[in-house]
């Protein structure tokens, strides 16, 4: 008999089947189940939700497991029981076994799901579906605002009694105004989630104070309205492990590994999520490892993604204050993708705001390593790295994306790229190495490139406006800086190139001006750049039918020798051999230019006159001109001048 000891009211069982079949439990009984799934139980006749892990149905009533702290998956006899257990809020489950999902696992507020080294969840083998859901819902009822609410405001108003908002309530605001974060809204309208910190009513109007300022103007003319969503709050996933490596098992499809919608304070750390895509294959069924839609205050840390059909982390809707740290994504479409909310029909709402990616790595992505899809505001990547992407390393398709100390290696296109109409991404101290087309591509709408490096590409920087300041560029086969427009309709804006190292290393020109795309060199200024070694051939021009006016230039270097010295005037004149250079022809695809010679008088005799440079001459020796035999003349307005004069040669 399975009942091995009976000393009333103590009942001890060696197996679960015998315990749940026992017919004579009493409320006062002390009940113990032995074994790895064992524990102490109490008997009750009060109706309880059966999950076959913490609550069992037995003859005449229910057995309730006595425990403090988390429940363990090893307690449960099937997946359905775990789903039942987690269907209520305030749950804590430790997954310490391999679980075969047969449905979606929904996680409610104030819950924690953590995995041991042996715990994992295998996706449903019968139906491709989501694995873990943290899902709230949009408001079912909206009310109009009572007055306009301007961007920056932390107060909205509604008619008194129209909205049952109290302190701690979440609100969902929206209007018909289109999002403005990027150049292509795709019809997505503005929306935001805010939390109520105070409510007051006066004169038929309720004023609601919000926890954060609004990012947009919510005007009555745009049908601005507000409702109360159902939010899932305060969920933590520790070391979630979804799927196993097994490329021959094509039944382990899932659409989304972890899906969150209308959630707040969701934190995922140290996970592993494995897709079902064969290594290197193009996209297949299965969208994202983690998806945040209309979520606020979310984090992902230290999580790895492998062979995902689409995205490692996807952020869309009005998700706000999302941080992703220390992820590793291998063979996915994008490691991180900021996206627009898409529906088959009907309205679309919200763009990601305040996104931060830190120390994230993407390997062998099938498209860009990191992408921002057309909308989004205040997006920043710090110390992120893309290796061997099949497209760009980083792609900015929304305005003003900022990259700090990021790196792109061996991208099939650009190391860092923007897209049509995207205005002024910001790159600071970033490195692009051996990318096929360019290190940094800002030719769709301008950009700012500060103290960056690009090595081993066709072009170091492609740009049509903005600023390239500081940094170092080597081994770029065509040019270090290519002034062009990748789309003819894009307007060229002023471009400053300042303090950049573009020394000649046997390949390419320093700067390439693309007349074919209508580039006007007079909108470019160049100062303090080191173009040592390029000599006469520092610039490349193409597509001009008449000779263009050169850019504004000051204190640029073409050589590192023969560019400084001291001359003593004799009878008001001195001829100086120096590496002065110039192009004096009128060929269309060339600039007419001459070196700038700065003169500084060192002595001041009574015969001193005004100084000027005349007669710049270039050596014409055949077959190889000698630049050290180039010369210029310093001439004083006083033929008796015997001053000593320091000279410096610049472009």
Residue ranges and their predicted role:
Residues 5-66, 92-142, 239:
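Extracellular beta-helix/beta-solenoid repeat scaffolds
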Residues 113-116, 165, 232, 236-239, ...:
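All-beta strand scaffolds that present successive hydrophobic residues in beta-strands
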Residues 175-202, 231-356, 361-364, 369, ...:
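Right-handed parallel beta-helix
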Residues 164-182, 215-241, 583-603, 642-651:
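Extended Gly/Ser/Thr-rich low-complexity repeat segments
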């Amino acid at each position: 008999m399975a009942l091995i000891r009976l000393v009333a009211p103590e009942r001890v069982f060696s197996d679960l089947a015998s315990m749940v079949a026992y017919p004579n439990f009493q409320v006062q009984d002390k009940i113990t189940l032995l074994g790895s799934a064992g524990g102490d139980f109490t008997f009750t006749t009060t109706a309880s939700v059966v999950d076959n892990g913490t609550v069992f149905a037995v003859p005449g009533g229910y057995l309730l497991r006595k425990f403090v702290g988390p429940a363990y998956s090893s307690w449960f006899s099937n997946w359905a029981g775990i789903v039942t257990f987690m269907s209520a809020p305030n749950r804590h489950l430790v997954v310490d076994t391999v679980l075969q999902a047969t449905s979606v696992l929904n996680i409610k507020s104030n819950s924690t799901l953590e995995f041991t080294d042996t715990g994992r969840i295998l996706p449903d083998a019968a139906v491709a579906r989501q694995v873990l859901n943290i899902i709230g819902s949009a408001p079912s009822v909206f009310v109009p605002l009572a007055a306009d609410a301007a961007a920056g405001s932390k107060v909205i108003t509604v008619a008194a009694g129209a909205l049952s908002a109290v302190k701690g309530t979440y609100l969902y605001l929206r209007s018909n105004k289109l999002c403005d974060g990027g150049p292509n809204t795709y019809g997505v309208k503005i929306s935001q989630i805010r939390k109520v910190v105070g409510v007051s009513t006066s004169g038929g109007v309720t004023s609601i104070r919000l926890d954060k300022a609004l990012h947009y103007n919510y005007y009555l003319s745009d049908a601005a309205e507000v409702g109360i969503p159902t939010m899932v709050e305060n969920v933590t996933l520790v070391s979630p492990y979804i799927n196993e490596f097994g490329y021959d098992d094509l039944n382990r499809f899932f659409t989304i590994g972890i899906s969150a919608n209308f959630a707040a304070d969701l934190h995922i750390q140290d996970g592993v999520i494995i897709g079902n895509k064969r290594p290197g294959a193009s996209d297949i069924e299965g969208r994202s490892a983690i998806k945040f839609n209309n979520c606020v205050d979310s984090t992902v840390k230290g999580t790895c993604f492998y062979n995902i059909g689409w995205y490692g982390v996807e952020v869309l809707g009005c998700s706000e204050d999302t941080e992703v740290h220390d992820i590793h994504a291998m063979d996915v479409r994008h490691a991180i993708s900021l996206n627009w909310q898409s529906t088959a029909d009907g309205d679309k709402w919200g763009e990601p705001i305040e996104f931060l990616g830190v120390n994230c790595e993407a390997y062998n992505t099938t498209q860009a390593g990191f992408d921002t899809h057309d909308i989004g505001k205040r997006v920043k990547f710090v110390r992120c790295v893309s290796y061997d992407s099949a497209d760009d390393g980083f792609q900015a398709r929304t305005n003003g994306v900022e990259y700090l100390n990021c790196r792109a290696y061996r991208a099939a296109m650009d190391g860092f790229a923007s897209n049509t109409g995207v205005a002024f991404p910001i790159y600071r101290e970033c490195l692009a190495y051996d990318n096929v087309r360019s290190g940094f591509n800002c030719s769709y709408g301008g950009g700012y490139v500060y103290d960056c490096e690009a090595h081993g590409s066709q072009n170091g920087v492609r740009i049509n406006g903005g600023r390239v300041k500081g940094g170092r560029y080597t081994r770029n086969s065509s040019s270090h800086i290519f002034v062009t427009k990748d789309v003819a309709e894009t307007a060229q804006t002023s471009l400053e190139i300042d303090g950049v190292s573009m020394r000649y290393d046997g390949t390419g020109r320093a700067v390439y001006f693309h007349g074919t795309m209508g580039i006007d060199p007079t909108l470019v200024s160049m100062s303090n750049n080191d173009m040592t070694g390029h000599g006469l051939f520092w610039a490349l021009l193409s597509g001009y039918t008449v000779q263009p006016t050169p850019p504004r230039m000051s204190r640029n270097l073409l050589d590192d020798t023969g560019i400084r010295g001291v001359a003593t005037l004799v009878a008001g004149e001195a001829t100086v051999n120096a590496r002065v250079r110039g192009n004096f022809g009128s060929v269309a695809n060339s600039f007419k230019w001459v070196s700038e010679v700065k003169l500084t008088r060192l002595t001041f005799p009574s015969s001193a006159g005004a100084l000027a440079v005349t007669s710049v001459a270039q050596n014409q020796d055949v077959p190889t001109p000698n630049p050290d035999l180039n010369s210029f003349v310093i001439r004083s307005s006083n033929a008796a001048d015997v001053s000593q004069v320091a000279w410096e040669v610049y472009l």
